[in-house]
């Protein structure tokens, strides 16, 4: 309500007399103005708040707006062995389940900037105009070690409620080689107390997703150029594997051998589909454009193999030689 409207409203009744027809007309005009003001304010609030609700990922660094795309449309009967009712999504962890068309599924992909790399590759490799819907909600510089900066369990709870995915892809860890605060005390990476606390957070994220009815695929960290940093990633990968083993509706996918040369070491260049390509960025951490396609191709193949569905990358990018 503006100050002029308030003044006019009070002036009509300031002498205590009964308002006449002219006063009633003025009163109706004032009230109409107030109604328009209230409606306008309500609309503005909704327009401003909506993006923060629907787009929780960061606006800077490697992050982009959420990507929603699609993959192969296929129609097929639901397998009798499917563990959960997905309403047309045929992903299944049941041993011996027949391989069927993937159906209509929503895949939520979350993680740090390496997760972003994976998500961008998936957005290109999952065919458009079909019924596998990708929702990419990564945030750079995040992980599970610093919940004070970004609380992934809380964010995931919101995302699960918004998108109701049948599969959650998790790819993070690049920022987690650091100390943590637990119950007000600082604990150092990778002490026994640290690994125990971190494993608890890993399991919390997995359980939160599977309790919502989704399956989980945790994509591990790759070999890194810096040997010490790479060793830290191996420690984290072992914790992701432990977390996944505790839940029958979750799977772990290792990328270590995929991006290691025959000697098991970091190498930035390899032949992809017979052509020499850079797989990694100059920082020795992130994936290049081609590397994004390589990991996306690999993850799509792993989704098909682990969850018994027919799923083929649009333009498969495969390492053919080192």
Model-derived segments and spans:
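Conserved SGNH/GDSL esterase-like catalytic core that processes O-acyl groups on lipids
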Residues: 88, 96-193, 321
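Solvent-exposed, polar/charged alpha-helical surfaces in well-ordered, non-transmembrane soluble domains
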Residues: 116, 120, 124-127, 154, ...
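Soluble non-cytosolic domains of exported or imported proteins
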Residues: 101, 112-117, 146-151, 188-200, ...
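Catalytic His-Asp segment of secreted/periplasmic serine-dependent ester chemistry enzymes
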Residues: 223-322
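Active-site segments of SGNH/GDSL-like serine hydrolases
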Residues: 171-177, 181, 205-237, 256-257
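Charged, glycine-enriched surface loops/patches
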Residues: 186-215, 219, 247-250
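N-terminal secretory targeting modules
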Residues: 1-108, 306-322
